[in-house]
Amino acid sequence: MKKQKRILFDKKNKFHFYYIWSVKNPKVWVHIIHGMSEHAVRYDELASELNKEDILVTADDHRGHGETGRSMKSLFHFSDSDGWSKIIKDQIDLISEQNIRCPLIILGHSLGSYMAMNVLQQIEKLKTNVKVSGLVLSGSGYESKWLYRINKLIAKIEIFRCGTRASSNILQKLSFESFNNNFSPTRTASDWLSRDENQVKKYVEDPLCGGAPSTKTWFDFMHGMNQIFNSRNLNLIDKKIPIHFISGDKDPVGKNGKGVVKFKNLLLDAGFKQVTLKLYPESRHELINDLDRDKVIADVKIWLRAILN
C-alpha cells in the first residue's frame, strides 16, 4: 500500500511527521527508526516489501531530520536542550498513539539502532503499556564506554567553540569523513554507505540527507550512548527479547564486523538469551540500499516469521 504521511503535535504545536504503510489485516507491526542525517521516506522500498507479508510499517522523521527538521527549521539539529531525551520520548509517544493490535518489532538503523535500545530501556523505566516483541538492529556497532565519554567531552568543547547549532569540522572528521578511508577509489564522500552507485547518488543529491549534525546533536548522541551501555539500564530490558543484528562486513560503523560482534557479545555477557547476528560479505553501511538488499530483506522476513512462530 502507498505510504500515508501523518503529523503528531508536541505541546508547543510543533510538527512531528511520520509515515504509515498499512495493510488490511496486519500480522506484525514493524516500526522503523532511521539513522543520522537521513529520513523515513528512504525506507519506502523496505516497507513496501514488508507489506507483501501482511506487515504494517511505521516510521518517523526525527527532530532535525526530514520533514520534521525542515518544518522546525532545524535540519540536522535535535534540540537546543535535552535532545536525546526528546527523540526517545517522540518514539514512545508515536508508538503509544497507534491503535495497532499485533506484535511490534522495532527495526533501527545506525543511530536508530541505539535509539531502539534506549526506547526499550525507557519503556521499562516509565512503566508504559508498550510491548516490544523483538529488535532488528542494522548498521550498528560498539567501541567502548571511555571512548563515548571522550567524544562527549570533545562535543562539549566544540559547543563552546562553535555554538550549539553549528557544525564542527573536528566532529565531522572523527565520524562521517573517516568512514570513507577504507575505500579506494571513491567517487563521493558517501561511498561508505553502499556499493550501489545509484543509491549513493540519490543520497548525495537529497537535500534532506548527508548534512553535518550540529555540535549539540553529537553531544546528545554521545550522552545517549553512555545511557544505553550503562549496566543498570541494560538490566531494565527483558533478557528474553529476541535481538537480531544485521551488518555488512565492510561497514565502517561496525568496524567491518568487529564492532557488531562486540555489541552482540556485550549483550550475551549481560544475560540476553536470544541474540543473533548476520554479516553480509562485502556489504557496506546501508544494507537495504546495497547490492544484496533483496537477500537482506528476505532474511529479515524469515527472522520475523521465526520469532513470531
Identify the role of each PLM range.
Residues 12-22:
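A short loop-to-beta-strand scaffold at the N-terminal edge of the catalytic core in hydrolase folds
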Residues 116-208:
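Alpha/beta-hydrolase-fold enzymes
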Residues 245-247:
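Short beta-strand/loop motif that positions the catalytic acidic residue
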Residues 78-97:
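Alpha/beta-hydrolase active-site loop
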Residues 34-38, 110, 249-250:
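Active-site glycine-rich loops that stabilize anionic/oxyanionic intermediates
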Residues 108-112, 116:
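Gly/Ala-rich beta-loop-alpha elbow adjacent to hydrolase catalytic centers
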Residues 47-73:
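Conserved alpha/beta-hydrolase
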Residues 270-309:
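Catalytic active-site module of serine/aspartate enzymes centered on a nucleophile-bearing elbow/loop
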